[in-house]
A protein has these predicted regions:
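Flexible, small-/acidic-enriched active-site or ligand-binding loops
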Residues: 228
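C-terminal active-site subregion of NodB/CE4 polysaccharide deacetylases
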Residues: 224
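Charge-rich, well-structured scaffold segments of protease-associated domains
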Residues: 3, 9, 20, 64-214, ...
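Short, cationic low-complexity segments
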Residues: 270
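Active/ligand-binding-proximal structured segments within catalytic/core domains
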Residues: 13, 20-71, 180, 253-265, ...
């Protein structure tokens, strides 16, 4: 556990985790729910994200404009986000306004009246349409489909336009009642705060009890261990390409090895992919590797955007780099540089109360240990050349890698 982090549980079962940062005069507060697009059926595709929008539209005490005016009047910045496994409302504000901001976020989370739903449908449909016009974003969804197929992890967070256009209010309200329950909620805060005071505020939250017969257990997802091809035809200047396969889950102790491997391979401006594809050959402006971790699986992937004339060479270079990282040990210089890069990001993010809040929230939501900064740095320092080689060999085998592409012509 971090030196200043504390975890408590309210009488209703809500978990509360806080981290005191006495050197600041602000607080970052998040109300997190263990629900996202992974928890949807095909008939609900996109309801988690749509519901996130609707939480801002009105409560018994505030209209949508009054919610915005209230936050502005408290000098707060606020927003919300939905992922495949979580949804959360969050705000940053002066510490003197903690009570008021907490009450407002709590009312939005649990007492939304879902007014003006049709106008917000149109907003979300426009967001989906905008996303469709961004091939550099959409290609990651096609890769997820190739890896996870017709499972919740294979579907996009925004969902399907026909579902959003037609899903009725009672179905949205039922989803809210079944997912926004005490056992699924974590209150997280970081900044100049008092833990016991935050717990007292959380005690006032009154989520619905878990409906009879409803379970929050996750259905296991079994990613494809055989590579697949997904191609989407679109009139684009560049071809947007993702290559990737199943990765490690978020509880895997090798997540620190993965962070260092990513830095070496494609996660920094001195990485192998950046140097070879962009700097040495000029084949792309944007190229890199990335990883995602979920409860029981993950993704390890590469992205490149390049013009049609460069597609073949870019893919050939990336293939060669995949072979090299998988079969040849990295140098000690590369390893040291990557470790310092990862540690630097950890330390710099620790200077943000919002980043600290998000880190302790995710750890609590997913039953992970709350590591101190020194503990995380020690785990990065402990990564060895052998561990990098072993993980790269496991994740980057050609037989398990899928390819997704958005471009003009599949041939």
């Amino acid at each position: 556990m971090t030196e200043t982090a504390r975890v408590s549980e309210t009488a209703s079962g809500i978990q509360v985790v806080t981290e005191v940062v006495p050197s600041v005069r602000s607080v970052a507060l998040g109300l997190w729910v263990r629900t996202g697009s992974r928890d949807e059926t095909p008939a609900q595709a996109g309801v988690s994200h749509f519901l996130e929008h609707l939480l801002f539209k009105g409560t018994p005490n505030y209209s949508a404009i009054e919610i915005s005016e209230r936050f502005d009047g408290l000098g707060a910045s606020f927003n919300a986000a939905t992922s495949k496994e979580t949804t959360h409302l969050y705000a940053r504000f002066l510490d003197e306004h903690t009570d008021e901001v907490f009450d407002l976020l709590g009312e939005m989370l649990l007492e939304s009246t879902f007014p003006d739903i049709d106008s917000e449908r149109d907003v979300v449909l426009e967001e989906i349409a905008m996303y469709e016009d961004e091939p550099s974003d959409r290609v990651h969804d096609y890769l997820a489909d190739a890896i996870f197929g017709d499972t919740p992890l294979g579907r996009r967070i925004l969902g399907k336009a026909d579902v959003i256009a037609n899903i009725p209010v009672p179905d949205i309200a039922a989803y809210h009642r079944s997912r926004y329950t005490a056992d699924n909620i974590v209150v997280a805060a970081a900044g100049n705060l008092d833990h016991d005071a935050i717990v007292a505020m959380a005690e006032k939250l009154k989520p619905e009890p878990l409906p009879e017969g409803v379970s929050h257990s996750l259905e296991p997802v079994h990613p494809s261990m055989n590579g697949r091809l997904e191609f989407a035809t679109k009139d684009t200047e560049q071809y947007h390409i993702c290559i990737g396969g199943p990765g490690i889950d978020r509880s895997d102790e090798r997540r620190f090895v993965m962070a260092v491997l990513d830095s070496i391979f494609g996660g920094s401006s001195s990485s192998r992919l950046f140097r070879e594809v962009r700097e040495n050959r000029g084949l792309a402006y944007s190229v890199g590797s990335y990883s995602e971790q979920f409860t029981d699986t993950g993704v390890a992937a590469i992205y490149v955007g390049t013009r049609e004339d460069n597609v073949e060479e870019a893919c050939s270079v990336i293939g060669a780099e995949l072979d090299t990282i998988r079969t040849s040990p990295v140098s000690e210089d590369e390893l040291l540089r990557a470790k310092e890069h990862v540690k630097g990001r950890l330390v710099l993010s620790g200077e943000s109360t919002a980043a600290r809040m998000g880190r302790i929230a995710r750890a609590t939501l997913h039953d992970l240990p709350l590591l101190t900064l020194d503990e995380m740095i020690a785990r990065v320092d402990a990564v060895s050349v052998g561990e990098i080689s072993e993980l790269a060999s496991e994740l980057y085998g050609s037989e398990r890698l899928s390819l997704a592409c958005v471009g003009r012509d599949e041939d």
